[in-house]
């Protein structure tokens, strides 16, 4: 049975569980508990960045002084409020 050599990279990025079998032989199980957490964190940050870009875009659009946009402006504001509430809930 071959055993994998641990490099500094695998030691730093993988969590190593060492279990003892009934016959006294030790086995190593490599897992990535932090990779899932990191991906989740990355996605959360990226969604916030996307949200910020949308807010900046809508604020720029809404700041335009065009009388034909009066009714659109209120409609968009209502939709934006609903959308942002749903985003923060989920």
Curated annotation (Swiss-Prot):
Annotated stretches, region: Mitochondrial targeting sequence: 65-87
Compartments reported by the entry: Host mitochondrion inner membrane; Host nucleus; Host cytoplasm, Host cytosol
Cystines in this chain: none
Protein's GO biological process: symbiont-mediated perturbation of host apoptosis; symbiont-mediated suppression of host cytoplasmic pattern recognition receptor signaling pathway via inhibition of MAVS activity
UniProt site (Low pathogenicity): 66
Sequence segments annotated as region (Disordered): 1-31
UniProt keywords, alphabetically: Apoptosis, Host cytoplasm, Host membrane, Host mitochondrion, Host mitochondrion inner membrane, Host nucleus, Host-virus interaction, Inhibition of host innate immune response by virus, Inhibition of host MAVS by virus, Inhibition of host RLR pathway by virus, Membrane, Modulation of host cell apoptosis by virus, Viral immunoevasion
GO (cellular component) term, any one: membrane
Signal peptide: none
Family named by the database record: Belongs to the influenza viruses PB1-F2 family.
Function: Plays an important role in promoting lung pathology in both primary viral infection and secondary bacterial infection. Promotes alteration of mitochondrial morphology, dissipation of mitochondrial membrane potential, and cell death. Alternatively, inhibits the production of interferon in the infected cell at the level of host mitochondrial antiviral signaling MAVS. Its level of expression differs greatly depending on which cell type is infected, in a manner that is independent of the levels of expression of other viral proteins. Monocytic cells are more affected than epithelial cells.
Note: Is not encoded in all strains, and seems to be dispensable for replication.
Protein name (record): Protein PB1-F2
């Amino acid at each position: 049975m071959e055993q994998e050599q641990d490099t500094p990279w695998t030691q730093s990025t993988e969590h190593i569980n060492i279990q003892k079998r009934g016959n006294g032989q030790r086995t190593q199980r490599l897992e990535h508990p932090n990779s899932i957490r990191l991906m989740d964190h990355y996605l959360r940050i990226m969604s916030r960045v996307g949200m910020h870009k949308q807010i900046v875009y809508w604020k720029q659009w809404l700041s335009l002084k065009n009388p034909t946009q009066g009714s659109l402006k209120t409609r968009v504001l209502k939709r934006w409020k609903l959308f942002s509430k749903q985003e923060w809930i989920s």
